[in-house]
A protein has these predicted regions:
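Membrane-helix boundary/coupling elements in multi-pass transport proteins
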Residues: 158-183
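Residue-level recognition of membrane-helix boundary sites in multi-pass small-molecule transporters
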Residues: 6-7, 99-102, 160, 175-178
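Membrane-water interface regions at transmembrane-helix termini and the short interhelical loops
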Residues: 1-15, 89-96, 167
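Hydrophobic core positions of alpha-helical segments in small-molecule transporters
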Residues: 11-14, 103-106, 182
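Loop-to-helix junctions at membrane interfaces in multi-pass transport proteins
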Residues: 17-162
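Transmembrane helix-loop junctions in multi-pass membrane proteins
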Residues: 1-6, 121-132, 167, 174
Length: 183
């Protein structure tokens, strides 16, 4: 229990749950606080200077031109997920086919939720944090946590827990990569 594959799996599960709760809760609270003031998401996007009609359309670029090549190439990203060494080793550890079915469903659900809500965070960030539109876009999740939990809710302890979720993502990947490279 103190090391090896089992320890990595246990810590990855705990860190993964922290990340999942954070990536689901933070944008939902931010959306609530955005819409409580009477602002809609599309109105917030328009106020931020983004062309909201094209911003929410997957087939258009920001300037209105077609984006089909970007969409097709973006679909290829999902194929690389199953070849990642730290993911592949988890599937190799499955005991039988019944567990493999559950493992696949869990992995697909995790990826769909995490990536879907990551996109939602990016879209919501333009409306909820308009000061980041032309600045530090990579800080959108951190700034969203700070605004929701320290400004709106006055709960800095919860903000700290969700900020730890970012560190959990880093540590989870690092220990999985170390395990794969050491074996």
């Amino acid at each position: 229990f103190l090391g090896g594959f089992t320890a990595v799996c246990v810590t990855d599960f705990i860190q993964g749950m922290l990340m999942l709760v954070g990536i689901l809760a933070v944008p939902l609270f931010a959306y609530h606080f955005l819409t409580t003031g009477g602002t809609t998401l599309s109105a917030g996007l328009e106020a931020s200077g983004a062309d909201s009609a094209n911003f929410l359309n997957l087939m258009k670029n920001g300037d209105g031109s077609n984006n089909i090549i970007s969409v097709i190439s973006g679909l290829g990203w999902g194929l690389g997920y199953f070849g990642m060494p730290h993911i592949l080793v988890r599937f190799m550890a499955v005991r039988d086919e019944k567990e493999m079915t559950k493992s696949k469903a869990t992995a697909i659900s995790w990826v769909a939720l995490s990536l879907g809500f990551a996109v939602f965070i990016g879209i919501l960030g333009r409306a909820y944090l308009p000061e980041l539109v032309n600045g530090n876009n990579e800080k959108v999740f951190i700034e969203m946590i700070k605004k929701v939990f320290t400004v709106e809710m006055r709960a800095p302890f919860i903000a700290g827990l969700f900020l730890c979720g970012i560190l959990a993502a880093i540590m989870s990947t690092a220990d999985s990569q170390l395990l794969v490279s050491a074996s």
